Amino acid sequence: MAIISTKELNIYFEKSEFKMNGPLLYIGGTGGDLRNRPNQLHSPLSDEFEVIAYDQRGLGQTSKPLGDYSMKQYADDAASLLDELGIETIPVMGVSFGGMVAQELVKRHPSRVSKLVLACTSSGGAGGASYPLDELEALSEDEKLERSIKINDLRITDRWIKDNINAWNDLKNNAKTRLTYKPDSKNLLKQLIARKGHNTYESLSSIDVPVFLLGGKYDGIAPVENMESMHLKIIDNKLEFYEGGHLFLIQDKKAFKDIVNWLLS
């Protein structure tokens, strides 16, 4: 665990143990904070790669600059981290909002990315936008929690809740207690507003590295059609869907195995 200073901010990052397969840059999702355990550093990725993960601007133990944030800044932060670590090029995995940042990274700094994994994310623009999470901020905490669970997994309908009330209550309780560290509302909103303006659709055809696209079959945040739009636009890519919603990486154990195998191929 360490903090690196760039021109704009101090970035908090962590690495898993050294592995012969080399490093992998992991860019996490909305509201991510490495103090919440377990996280990507404890995933199957770290069995094969030296995973590098970091708190994005406004979150966790990274600086929280004044003013609005932009997707370009998020991408440049990732590139600056690589600069300070002395890494010229690296495989990158972006999940959800992190997938949007990864798209912007390969657009703005194409030479830094050797392979790209994009999970449960969207391109914006004509390729479709992810669910507007900023709209949930106007809801009460209970309403926001329930709505978030439902859009995370479209199988959770009102009918399902009626038939599985105990399981529903368990889901809500788990969601309430899952994250020890939560972002403050002001900086979270900055991230959500930047996310709202995300649009890399037209640049996807310029990506000249292999891309692995992964989605959840029941994801209401980054729906199937958004992943399919990216699949049609990116020249060299593979697309797979898994049993689960936005959290399919947890729900379907096959997903991480496929990611590792693809990265090693």
Where are these regions (language model features)?
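Conserved HGGG/HGGXW glycine-rich cap/lid loop of the alpha/beta-hydrolase fold
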Residues: 7-63
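Conserved alpha/beta-hydrolase "acid-adjacent" motif
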Residues: 220-226
